Amino acid sequence: MYKTFSMELAGRTLTIETGKLAQLANGSVLVRYGDTVVLSTATASATPREGVDFFPLSVDYEERLYAVGKIPGGFIKREGKPSEKAILTARVIDRPLRPLFPKDLRNDVAIVNTVLSVDQDNSPELAALLGSSIAVSISDIPFNGPVGAVILGLIDGEVIINPTEKQKEISQMYVTLAGTRNKIVMIEAGANEVPDEVMLDAIKKGHEEIKKIVDFIDGIVKEVGKPKFEYESAEVPEEIFNAVREYAYDKMREAVLAVDKQVRDKNIDDLTKEITEHFAEVFPEMEPAIKEAIYKLEKKVVREYILEEGRRVDGRRLDEIRPLSAEVGLLPRVHGSGLFTRGQTQVLSSVTLGAMGDVQILDGIDTEETKRYMHHYNFPGFSVGEAKSSRGPGRREIGHGALAERALEPVIPSEEEFPYTIRVVSEVLMSNGSTSQGSVCGSTLALMDAGVPIKKPVAGISAGLVVDENNPDRFVTFMDIQGIEDFFGDMDFKVAGTKDGITAIQVDIKIDGLTEEIIKQAFELTRKGRLYIIDNVLLKAIPEPRKQMSKYAPKIISTTINPDKIREVIGPGGKMINKIIDETGVKIDINDDGRVYIFSSDIQAGKRARSMIEAIAKDIEPGQVFLGRVIRVTSFGAFVEFLPGKEGLVHISKLDKKRVERVEDIVRVGDQILVKVIEIDKQGRVNLSRKDAMEDEWDK
């Protein structure tokens, strides 16, 4: 049955339509927020997937360019693979929903969001997140929601809920916040050095709005929600877990204690083999369940060390960071490089500087068309000791790259200050947790090594969490999580920033949400950590950005011309500018306001190109004398190119002081001659005189 539900959200109407579209899905809703329209669907398989030890959830966010009245570029003229923005949005939707599905559910669940219309002021990403939550909540798929979400801005110290496009442009932060009625389940933020306490206050205010949205969704579920289906639990049989725990508890406590990840992994592998062989006869044909019990025991032991004893499996205190080191200038030919190492996590970041014409062109549903600063993250198999080939970046790599990019963006100099396109690539060489935050630190080092005048160094670190499963009010937070703590812990709270404030946040959780106290402690820990890294590691490796750029980086020569002359400099079909580029080997970028940037590794070639551009853009006035080249001869005179791309006519009567019978008697094609501008007619044609120019020379 078709029904609609509406509420006011940030001064605009949010409307949910059910019972009309995509009725074969387990749950579907059409979300309208202003003129932004998104179809959200949730579908589950009837039976569990065989042979998996995880919950098989997939989330897609599909942009349709017709939503903004665009036809896709290229030859194919249809949408292809998801854009980077679509992948990042899918991850933002996935993270708050995944922890609220039953841990032992093994049925495939697919959430698909199709963007049908976008008005730019009302975020389709937010509409998709809300639509996904509602679609799952009203479906028969087991789910412990619902989840509400808002976007937070900050303008002149005031928190703005769901800012418009104009407000986003001047906002000091852009935070996607999701939560249930009592807890926060996801934070994704980019900010311009927002103090920790201001961010915490904004999260509190955002949660108050989320509670209203959750109440609204509960009302929808009450009216149209389906009963949840029964499913086959993938939980380890209690008998098997108890047997494994009794046999191997003390051995597991000993096995996990190691500073070195490889030593610990070998200990666990050896113990797993021993346990599996021991129980092969006791529980025949139950090897998968035995291995799941071993995993569960390892998790229990690691968490007990943290929660009960206040120590970690590598011997660190809860607030202790792994050994740190930083180096710059490792790679001789790149424009800038930095190596950041934290324990057994190691990231090598490299900077490449390019012309403004090298910016990334974006073809999506956003108004943003180009990107000048880019960060790419690579995670090869060898970084975790795996023998596998590289198949290009996946969703995780794209997400981690975007996080580090967002962290550095506020400190990147403006185009006016530093007119380069900047690309940073972070190569993960070793991974034992927090590689994205290692990429933030590596990027800072590489940018400073390249001579990019970043405003301040940025560091990143993460906080972890273990909550008592029997008493949710009892928990422990800790700093700088390693791989095993990320794997078995309840939270990965990543924060990057400068000494003065936060620039990026990304929070992943595995429980039903975070309380205000947990978030507060996480901010305190990460602030302490990032200040320590900036002062004691980054600034000791390189105290400030280099004054001199690499000799291999392109040099910039700039000039300013009259904007009305841009067309002349470019020439018909790009003829003039391409001629300059071909003759000098430079790259040229011309802004609409007349600013011209010339990029060249050869400074003399750059100066020559600048002279040619300035000559073309120069205003021509009667009386000026030029040394020109004859390019064409006719019966009535000679055409002379007196400036690059500019030519004029020397009439036969103006070739010499004596009478001239044939033009060829005086000049031929290719001759260089002095000419004087006599007049510029109404059509812009330039009349020249060799005779007058020669008389001026004789007078001297």
From Swiss-Prot:
SMART domains: KH (SM00322), S1 (SM00316)
Record keyword RNA-binding present: yes
Residue intervals of the S1 motif domain: 623-691
PANTHER family named in the record: POLYRIBONUCLEOTIDE NUCLEOTIDYLTRANSFERASE, POLYRIBONUCLEOTIDE NUCLEOTIDYLTRANSFERASE 1, MITOCHONDRIAL
Reactions performed catalytically: RNA(n+1) + phosphate = RNA(n) + a ribonucleoside 5'-diphosphate
Example of a GO cellular component annotation carried by this entry: cytosol
Gene3D superfamilies given in the database record: GHMP Kinase, N-terminal domain (3.30.230.70), K Homology domain, type 1 (3.30.1370.10), Nucleic acid-binding proteins (2.40.50.140)
Descriptive protein name: Polyribonucleotide nucleotidyltransferase
Binding site for Mg(2+): 486, 492
EC numbers: 2.7.7.8
Signal peptide residue numbers: none
KH domain: residues covered: 554-613
Gene designation: pnp
Alphabetical keyword list: Cytoplasm, Magnesium, Metal-binding, Nucleotidyltransferase, RNA-binding, Transferase
Role played: Involved in mRNA degradation. Catalyzes the phosphorolysis of single-stranded polyribonucleotides processively in the 3'- to 5'-direction.
Entry GO MF terms: 3'-5'-RNA exonuclease activity; magnesium ion binding; polyribonucleotide nucleotidyltransferase activity; RNA binding
Annotated localization: Cytoplasm
HAMAP family xrefs: PNPase (MF_01595)
GO process terms (BP): mRNA catabolic process; RNA processing
Cofactor(s) of this protein: Mg(2+)
Record InterPro entries: ExoRNase_PH_dom1 (IPR001247), ExoRNase_PH_dom2 (IPR015847), ExoRNase_PH_dom2_sf (IPR036345), KH_dom (IPR004087), KH_dom_type_1 (IPR004088), KH_dom_type_1_sf (IPR036612), NA-bd_OB-fold (IPR012340), PNPase (IPR012162)
Highest taxon listed in the record's lineage: Bacteria
A Pfam match: S1
Family per record: Belongs to the polyribonucleotide nucleotidyltransferase family.
